[in-house]
Amino acid sequence: MMENARILYVDLTKRSTMVKELDKEIYRKYPGGSALGMYIMLKEMDAEVDPLSPENMLIFSVSPLAGFPISGQSRMNVTAKSPLTGTAGDSQVGGYIAPHVKGNGYDAIVFTGKSEKPVYLYIDGDQAEIRDAAKMWGKVTGEAEDLIFEDLGHNKIESSIIGPAGENLVKYANIMHQRSRANGRNGLGAVMGSKNLKALAVKKTPTRKPADRELFKTLTINVKERMAANETIVSTTQDGSGGCVEGHAAEGFLPSYNWDKGLMDGWENTAGYTLTEKYLINRETCFGCAIRCKRVVDVPGKAEPKYGGPEYETMSTFGSYCGNTDLSDICHANQLCNMYGMDTISCGATIAWAMDAFEKGILTTEDTDGMVLKFGSGEHFEELIKKIANRQTGIGALLAEGSARAAEKIGKGAEDLVVANKKQEWPAHMVQFKPNLAVNYAVNNFGADHQSSEHDPALMAPKDDQNWIWPNQLAEFEDCDRYGVLDDNKAKFAFVTQKFYSMMDTLGLCQFAWGPAWQLYGPDDLVTFCKASIDWDTSIDELQEIGERRLVMMRMFNAKIGFTRKDDNMPKKAFLPITDTAGNVDQITEEEFEAALDSYYRYAGWDIKTGVPKKATLDRLGLAWI
């Protein structure tokens, strides 16, 4: 059953720690993830704080379900006000740290203030110690972790670490875990750096035992059979998310040349199967997960196994976005971003923007420190990434701000080349071919994100598809062609599946195992998991409401800062026509987009003019206190 949440508060200014408990009845409404993070921020922090000031909170939180050995769960969330978007910031990471945060007795760790000098926090049960990090400061993530092992005298920890990008307040700095996993997007690594906090290290703990072992076993005993019967899972295990390169290229919606085209010549050289054939040496997994989607590559002189390997978004942003077909350069860029602690989507997309601006004469060699930045090559990736991470005067400092702010500074039409929402660069899924994502990208509370709603192809599957595991929840939608216009059906699909994804983010679940379509587990399994693990009697309706509550809390946080419908917009390139491989010209019109936005707001119970949740919606979700 749900217990009180234990929250560790760490005041870095005063170098003090204390534990508070949150009543279990309140915790049930905000059970982990950024639902809990947003509850704390809305209750205890002024939304108008500078994201890089000591007043901004940095909250690490886990789900009450964390630490049980089942596929696709035990993800850790980080919440703060984002320096990239200026909105509520949110990020999840897999790997192994969440179970040990929970195993040490904490549901959340809240950092406030700013340390006078670099420090890290070490947790071993009830002992939470702020330790000196002078030796680690300035080091890349792998070296810093080794120095933490040395400082503690053992390596029985899991850690979250920033690299030089976080220390230098790069707007899209990541918080890295196990050198190859990231709390990415939103620049939360810069928030950590602004506090002079180099790392969070937690002592490893035993695996939790479920409340009902026999019931729990019904979910795990046949996992291999479930996987073998699911083509999507088999493909994910084989080639990782990199398999999306060939899937998108086959139909002509692989974002290329900074989103001017839907296909890159030579894309086969960057495909998932090419990575598997040329460079893959291992597949890694997260806590308790059988899917093993993580790539581990070895590229002599360019990429070491300890920094993992690229997944689809990285393979696209440093590949087709830049017109680059050299997979070894992509692997090298991925390693450098992991070492320096930077988001590969924003970094690659910002470099692609710079190439676009250079080719159009907006940037010159005087702006780029002499580099000729043209589509078709990754030769300058290393120099650019290092300059960005270190905020080196010139092109490094400019691109460290992200493409939107860089364009604002440059002017001369550079803004028209930016592909971002709320200043966060787009992931590699084209809205001309997945129109529902146009709505999701626009309304998403922390900028464009491809993992905040289901994608349009789910609407093409017959409802009797054996891999369709959420039939009762998705049967209300009309089957439609993913290349169709953006209409009311797509807007409804965006809202309903956004609630599911929000629920998953709250409970620390991974979309590859628990997503709304073609995945390993379904809604009945989730309810069973809650019961079997912690004796939580719940329903899919309660869990969906938790997901919606999280969305609305984020929306209200943003509203307090002044974000409205005007900020739920599309970049100019989103409205460009794209010709697919079948010869169809696909395009979203501004009229279709605005009408779909109206529909979304109606389904969500938000005011159509302002985009702010209505009082009735707040009351229904128990959020009148906001």
How would you name each of these model-derived features?
Residues 1-189, 194-213, 217-238, 242-264, ...:
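Protein-protein interaction/assembly regions in multi-subunit complexes
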Residues 149, 156-160, 164-186, 190-626:
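Extended C-terminal regions of large enzymes
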